[in-house]
Every structure is written in structure tokens, then in C-alpha cells.
Amino acid sequence: MLWCSLSVFIGLSAISQGGVTRFIPGILVSTTILFYLIVIRANSVTYSSLKQFNTKTGVLSIASSAGTLCCVADTIYHMVMKSGAISKLMSKGISTTTIQAVVVIALLTMSFIAMYGVSVIFNYILSNVVALIDTIIDNKYEINNIVAIVVCALYFFLIVWVYRNTTAFYGSGYNDVIYGSDSYTLTGSNVWLSLFQGQNDLRQPLYMLTAAPFMGIAYILGIILNCFYVNGLAIAYAFVQALLLVWSIWLLSHLISNNDIIRSLIILILSVSYPAIVFSLCLEQYVSSFFWLIMAVVAVMYDQKKADLMIIGAANGLLTSAFMVVWKRAKSFVEWFQSAFKCGMMFLLTLFAFGRADIFLNIKANLAEIFQHTGKKLTIVDKAYQYSKFVVDCFVGQPAVEKVHKSGFLIWGSSESTTINVAGVIIIVLIVIAIIWNRESLLCKISASWIGFSVLLLCVLGWGTSSNALFLYSLYFSWAFWVPFFLSIQRIYNKGYKKSAIVILTCLFILIAKFNIAEFIRMLNFAIENYPL
């Protein structure tokens, strides 16, 4: 039943993206692998754990799977009704009502069959996420939980107000409007719920599996909100995205400190950092990728048994997150290599099991498209200019500029970097000092490696520099720059300078909020003026 259900889902997902033909090789490989894993190895430990229904997450899993399949079915319905075959049937005297009824019944039947398999997968993912989070929850601390809830509520109010006044952050009719984001395409194609959507390429091979367990419920919420707002679905997506963002920040605060007040201040500071403010509104893939990356960090620090699952989830959300595999614990290099190799094979098996063999069958074209973003025409010095500015962007919003896109519409983006950013260099020096001071901390080591990875990816390789759009990656990397600083404040607190530590964080919160809210208002004025609802 599970094999049949998942096979139907993969087939429906392929049809929703324009037909099965180009996905046939992947689907054949997928059904074969699933048949082996589910039918032949029906008594395996993995299969048994997959089918365990977790009551904590079961209802959410069912709701998210229902939302995901509603989205897929709705896409197929409109595709079928606009096809030439329908016109031919109507010309033969078959009424539109009859055709609609047949199509709806067929889609409902297939969706019902697929729902079982999707619910099982979503439940497996969510139950492991919740179980991992439970390992770091300390019930005696409550203020930081209240702070996180308040921040989330403020984000919700902000989303509703902004989305009622502008379309710039989700549906302006153009991509690149806000800091080079593809929000328009992502929202219009429901990228979070689409297994084969074009944006879910080699960079995010199984992005849907990491996002849909959360975003599926947003689709159902969006249907309800559409009764009150013309952009109800976008608001629902933004709600869940903001929830994942705050959840990630809350997790980071728990990794950094065991003090309730310090945790609360960390949540407040990170919530008003410029990347967090922008991505609380801008519908993008990076928020859920950021969430899964933090989950991978939690796993390698607290539960190595779940490390493989979280690293695979993070890598499917954004392939570069596979870098976290270097932090898998082992007694020797050989043991680590075997463990990393096993994780890599599991990643590929998951990829093929869910029909994404097409990514490797078209690997040359996929790589060519990806490497066009690397700024091959720029010198290493030009890339360093942009990177030094990017470091500052991870903390505060620098004055952005209104520009004219090459296609003629107005966009809001980073100003050109023609020299080294002094503030960025100062921050890097301070971060290096903080890393040295906290070098015994595993979290500090992980964040230091992630900073080094950002230098390699953004500065040396020059990812995103061709379009001067490094800000898009600020949320994904900024946490690593913040961690050594917060760990230093925690050490100051532990040494007995409690008031000093709290005063430093409080002043920093006020300062960061002042700068970032001012820049945010400038961006908002641009959005409302040029892209009103």
C-alpha cells in the first residue's frame, strides 16, 4: 500500500509540472527503489520506524499532506482544463460539467491514494525533528519561550500589514525586485509543495520534502485566508516561514546559552538583524534551508543517531549544507570516512527513491546553469569587496539603492561595492578574536568552519557575485558570524560580570533595531510606492 501510494504521489507531482515524459527515467528508478525498500525489505528496522505513527506530529502530517496534494491536484486540474484535449472532447458534444466531474473524481481518487504515503513520510520527518528538539528543551526556562512567541506574533502582524499594502515581497509580477529574490516565481509555482518544480534543481534537489511537512498546512490555511484577503495564500506561506525563522533563532539561543535572560536577548537581537527582518517578509527558499541547517547543527552536537537524517534533510534543502557532514563524530578518519560515505549514499538513495534521477541525467546542463552565478568575469579583489560588504549585511542593513532592472522595472538592491568595506574588515577581525577565545566550544568550531565555507563559496568561488546579490545568502550564513560573539558574552557572564553582559546585549539590541528598522522603512516605502497591492 505504501509503495503504491508513494508511486502515485510521484506520478502526480510529475504530471503537475507539465507531463511525465521527461521524468520517466526518474520515475522508473524511483518505483524500483521504493518497491525494494518497502515491499522486499518490509521487515527492516528502517521500514518499521518509518511506519510508526507519532501522535504529536500525526495530525500535522495528515494536514500537511492534504495541503500538498490539494496544491498538486489543483495545478493538474487547471492544466488539464486548459489543454487541447478538452476542447476536442467538448467539440464531440461532451459537456464541460461532465468533463470537470470526471477530472475532479479522478484527481480526488489518486490524491486519496497518495495521501497515505505522503502522511507517512511527513510524520517520519516531523517526529524526528520534534524528538531532536526535545533533547535540548529545558522546561525551567520560560521567559525566552514567551519572547519567541511575542516575536512570532509581531512578525505575523507585520506580514499582514505589509502584504495588504504591497506585492513586492511575493507577487509583484517580476523576480529580483527585493535584493534579487525570486519570490514571484517561487510563490506562483508553490515551490514549497512541488517535487519537480524547476527551482528545485541540483541546488535544492528534494527541497519539497524538507519544506512541505510545514508548508503543506499553509496551503490549507491559505484557502481559508483567501476568503478574507486576495493574497491569503501568500500570507499563509509567510506565516509558516516566519514561524520556521523564529524557531531556528530559538534553537540557536539554546545552543549558545543556558541562561534564560541571555537566550531572550539573543532571540531579540537576531530577530531584528537585517536578514531576519527581510526574510520574515520575502517569500524565499532560504528560510526553511536555514531551519534544516540549524537542525543539522543540533544533531551533530546532541544526537549523532539523527545526524544522518538531519544532514540529508539540510542537503536536500540546499546542497551546500552537506558540508555539515564534516562534523560527524568518529574515533578515526577511516571511521569518519565510512560514516560520511554512508550518509552520502543515503542521500543519493533518497534522491533516486523520490524520482529525481533527472537531475543527474541532465547534470551537464544543470551545472552550466548553476555556474553562471559565480562571477567568472570578476577578479578575486572584486569578490572580496562584495564579501566584506556581505559581512556587514549579516548584522545591519546598509543603505540600499533603487535601480532599474535590465528588463526595465524598478528593483531594490545592494549598492555596488567598489572598495573594501572597513566595517566588514573590523567585524571579521573581532570574530576571529572571539573564535580564538572560544576555540574549545564545539559550536564555535562549527560556526568557524561555516564562516570559512562562506569565504570559499562567496569570496573565492564568487557565488552570487555576478549579480551583486550576496545579501540573498545572509540569513544562511549570518548565524555563524553571530555565534562567536554571543559565546564571548556568555563567557563574560559566566565569569561573574552578569550585569555587564546583559547591558552589552541590551545596548546592542537597541542599536541594531535602530539601524535596521530605519533601513527597513526605506525598503518598505519603495515597495509600497512602486508595487502597491
Residue ranges of predicted features:
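Hydrophobic, aromatic-rich transmembrane alpha-helices
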Residues: Y124, N128-A131, W250-S253, A400-F409, ...
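Membrane-interface alpha helices of multi-pass inner-membrane proteins
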Residues: K305-E335, S339, C507
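Short hydrophobic/aromatic helix or loop-helix immediately within or flanking a transmembrane segment
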Residues: F196-Y229, I235, F239
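Membrane-lumen/periplasm interface segments of specific transmembrane helices
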Residues: L158-Y163, F337-A423
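Transmembrane-helix motifs of polytopic, lipid-linked glycan transferases
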Residues: A236-S257, I433
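Transmembrane-helix signature of polytopic, membrane-embedded enzymes
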Residues: W250-V272, K445
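Short acidic/glycine- and proline-prone juxtamembrane loop motifs at membrane-interface regions
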Residues: L281-V287
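Specific aromatic-rich, kink-prone transmembrane helix
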Residues: A276, S288-K305
